[in-house]
């Protein structure tokens, strides 16, 4: 099966201490309606205030915007913009808000989707900022996401009485089964630092974990009970780790398995005390136009191996390809304390650049026939399909433009084309690209 990703672009958004947002122009002609952003970040200062380090990410028609609420902490974000093929993947881009509401009950907000989703083929990622209040407890800022049925996205946090959160979320859904998804839900009871969730078997070399979301009852800014990572323990088990155990936490995310030529490499950065920069050689060079360097934890959070307090400059690392396309790199600001980070390099199978279709008729009536496309110069078979008995319609995908191929029926072969058979296809329409 052909790929579903049209492009990937990694943007560096440097939000210096005096800025609340950075706007960056995209360079690959993306249709931003079909784009989904992911992020890892490097916190240059030690602040733990969420209104300074938490960022929302959204698009204009040609740009990506990374925005926080207040100035102060410098943040360097690696934003990975994945553009999907709209013929194969439906992207829904919407906003949500968690208003400040008095009381101590758990807050749940449901947002209606524009289209019903097949939850076996859909996943979601969200980005948001703390729009009011300075409360630094994860009970307020940690917002868990999931689908509520097939028509709503659901967002949940423990407390809503001191802060408000708002941002954007992105649903991406395969329309033809090019990828399938499974929900991951892992609970950590108080006193527990490790747990797992079981999934149907996947091919790990074609599967990745959407950066996680979580719900927390930890009423403190210390990161050791909240910051964690998740990873594949096997093809049927996903496991989660945290160091501190002084709270109850729910982790909610998705596994995405591709059924095309997508290749996923998984690994881990071990930041020893005194280490800032980690680089790992990949099995080979990746095509940066179609490759995404991601973490499994939201925002590039690190898993602390020792108690490290509230200095958040050591708890985040951004990830990108550097110094070349054969190397994945993680970089944190502070070198204090030992940390771990799970990474994943996803080299997506490219979506075909061109689509074409037409109708096959004989004596004015639609017929079922094999339709083949060949490269005009080399004779390479670009694809074949069968026309439909309902109208004789056929549809093919190729990476070549219309000027580079010849279409013919099953009684014609390259290099001798049956022009009579070709003429029976009326009309041949070219689209896409």
Over which residues does each language-model region extend?
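Extracellular receptor-binding modules and their adjoining Ser/Thr/Gly/Asp/Asn-rich linkers
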Residues: 1-34, 41-44, 68-121, 127-131, ...
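Ser/Thr- and Asn-enriched, surface-exposed coil loops between beta-strands
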Residues: 14-24, 53-67, 99-107, 141-157, ...
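Extended low-complexity, serine/threonine- and proline-enriched intrinsically disordered segments
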Residues: 37-43, 53-54, 81, 125-128, ...
């Amino acid at each position: 099966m052909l790929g579903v990703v049209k492009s990937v672009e990694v943007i560096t958004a440097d939000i210096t201490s005096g800025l609340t947002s950075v706007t960056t122009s995209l360079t690959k002609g993306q249709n931003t309606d079909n784009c989904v952003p992911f992020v890892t970040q490097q916190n240059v200062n030690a602040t733990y205030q969420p209104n300074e380090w938490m960022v929302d990410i959204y698009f204009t028609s040609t740009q990506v915007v990374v925005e926080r609420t207040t100035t102060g902490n410098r943040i360097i974000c690696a934003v990975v913009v994945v553009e999907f093929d709209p013929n194969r993947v439906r992207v829904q881009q919407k906003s949500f808000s968690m208003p400040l509401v008095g009381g101590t009950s758990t807050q749940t907000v449901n947002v209606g989707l524009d289209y019903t989703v097949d939850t076996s083929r859909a996943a979601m990622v969200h980005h948001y900022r703390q729009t009011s209040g300075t409360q630094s407890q994860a009970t307020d800022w940690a917002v868990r996401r999931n689908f509520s049925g097939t028509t709503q996205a659901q967002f949940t946090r423990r407390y809503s009485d001191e802060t408000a959160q708002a941002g954007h979320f992105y649903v991406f859904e395969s329309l033809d089964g090019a990828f399938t998804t499974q929900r991951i839900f892992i609970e950590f009871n108080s006193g527990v630092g490790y747990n797992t969730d079981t999934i149907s078997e996947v091919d790990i070399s074609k599967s990745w974990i959407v950066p996680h979301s979580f719900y927390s009852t930890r009423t403190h800014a210390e990161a050791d009970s909240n910051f964690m990572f998740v990873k594949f323990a096997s093809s049927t088990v996903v496991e989660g780790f945290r160091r501190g155990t002084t709270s109850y936490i729910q982790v909610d995310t998705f596994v995405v398995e591709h059924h095309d030529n997508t290749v996923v490499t998984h690994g881990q950065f071990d930041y020893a005390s005194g280490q800032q920069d980690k680089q790992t050689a990949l099995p080979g060079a990746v095509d940066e136009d179609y490759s995404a360097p991601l973490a499994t934890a939201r925002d590039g959070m690190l898993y602390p191996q020792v108690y490290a307090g509230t200095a958040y400059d050591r708890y985040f690392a951004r990830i990108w390809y550097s110094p070349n396309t054969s190397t994945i790199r993680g970089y944190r600001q502070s070198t204090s304390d030992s940390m771990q980070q799970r990474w994943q390099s996803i080299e997506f199978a490219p979506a075909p650049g061109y689509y074409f279709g037409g109708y096959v008729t004989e004596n004015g009536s639609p017929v079922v026939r094999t339709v083949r496309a060949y490269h005009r110069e080399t004779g390479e078979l670009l694809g074949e399909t069968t026309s439909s008995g309902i109208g004789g319609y056929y549809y093919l995908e190729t990476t070549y433009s219309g000027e580079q191929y010849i279409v013919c029926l099953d009684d014609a072969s390259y290099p001798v084309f049956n022009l009579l058979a070709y003429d029976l296809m009326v009309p041949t329409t070219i689209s896409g690209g």
